[in-house]
């Protein structure tokens, strides 16, 4: 019985045996020549670049560690190359070659043959006979109607109200379920020269339709990066009722020339410089950046600017002849993905 008790662990209890600690798997370090060396090595002994893809490592922590060390190695090599190049340039002195110009989207573009020459007779004739000729000949003064999509939310409504303080003689009206085809004849009957429609998606403004009345054209823009006045840091006080100055940058192609004239026709001819307010439409990389500033004269030689808001970014989607007609309208230009495969834009 005693022996049986001893075998059963005494008192009928089963003896508990500790399992031997599992042997740690041997790590494989990849040498710089691509060969694998077996054996337990520290993480610091692994050579870079590894002879395998880091994404093939299944263990998440190990994969993150290897990727972090690989990035550190890349930064060290880049810094060492910069220091070496700097020493070589200092040693050569005046004989050092000029620094290479960094590649950007703008300087890598192919020259666009449609760039407008302001002294061209054909361009002058087009300007004298297009839809904006009555404005530039001072026969009409701008009167703008600003509206929204159906059931707008607060952010879109506030953007319309702030736009009305930027553009003189502009009026904000709510859609109330009316279609644009019914709104446009009413605008023409009340002598409005332009119609601006702010569209939204998920309570955020995401589109702008600008239609010149009564004969068009109509431009559709994608809107992004909207910032209202309260969201702008170090903004100035609310704008005054003075007519702002307008600045149009880089609207040099035929398409850009037409869009620039559309924006110019929104503002009266004679800006009131005493108000020191300026509205800027800056075209760069096929995006149109809108900013509204006030000049701050610090002295006779120093001038600063103070942003008033709002600010947003536009990207042209289509340009349509005539007023808004989504079904039978004739389009002069439509954004296509294949058009941006080349750098000739």
Curated annotation (Swiss-Prot):
Residues 142-325 form the Brix domain. The keyword Lipoprotein does not apply. It holds the Pfam family Brix. Residues 1-57, 70-105 are annotated as: Disordered. Residues 303-320 are annotated as: RNA-binding. Signal peptide: none annotated. Keywords: Nucleus, Ribosome biogenesis, RNA-binding, rRNA processing, rRNA-binding. It comes from the Eukaryota. Residues 87-97 have a biased composition (Basic and acidic residues). This is Ribosome production factor 1. It comes from Rattus norvegicus. The gene is Rpf1.
């Amino acid at each position: 019985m005693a022996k049986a008790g001893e075998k059963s662990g005494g008192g009928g209890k089963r003896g508990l045996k500790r399992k031997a600690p599992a042997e740690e798997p041997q790590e494989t370090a990849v040498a710089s020549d691509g060969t694998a060396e077996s054996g337990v090595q520290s993480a610091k002994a692994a050579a870079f670049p590894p002879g395998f893809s880091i994404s093939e490592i299944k263990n998440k922590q190990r994969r993150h560690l290897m990727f972090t060390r690989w990035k550190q190695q890349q930064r060290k090599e880049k810094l060492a190359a910069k220091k070496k190049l700097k020493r070589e340039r200092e040693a050569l002195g005046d004989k050092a070659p000029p620094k290479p110009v960094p590649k950007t989207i703008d300087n890598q573009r192919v020259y666009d043959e449609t760039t407008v020459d302001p002294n061209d007779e054909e361009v002058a004739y087009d300007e004298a006979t297009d839809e904006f000729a009555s404005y530039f000949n001072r026969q009409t003064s701008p009167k703008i109607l600003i509206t929204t999509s159906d059931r707008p939310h607060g952010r879109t409504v506030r953007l319309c109200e702030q736009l009305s303080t930027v553009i003189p003689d502009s009026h904000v009206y709510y859609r109330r379920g009316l279609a644009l085809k019914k709104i446009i004849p009413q605008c023409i009957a009340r002598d409005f020269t332009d119609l601006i429609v702010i569209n939204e998606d998920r309570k955020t403004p995401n589109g702008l339709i600008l239609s010149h009345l009564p004969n068009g054209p109509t431009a559709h823009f994608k809107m992004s990066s909207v910032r209202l006045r309260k969201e702008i840091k170090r903004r100035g006080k609310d704008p005054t009722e003075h007519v702002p100055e307008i600045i149009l940058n880089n609207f040099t192609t035929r398409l850009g020339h037409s869009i620039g004239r559309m924006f110019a026709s929104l503002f009266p001819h004679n800006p009131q410089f005493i108000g020191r307010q300026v509205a800027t439409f800056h075209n760069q990389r096929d995006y149109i950046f809108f900013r509204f500033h006030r000049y701050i004269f610090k002295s006779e030689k120093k001038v600063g600017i103070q942003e008033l808001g709002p600010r947003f970014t536009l990207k042209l989607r289509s340009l349509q002849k005539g007023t808004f007609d989504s079904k039978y309208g004739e389009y002069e230009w439509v954004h296509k993905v294949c058009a941006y495969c080349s750098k000739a834009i």
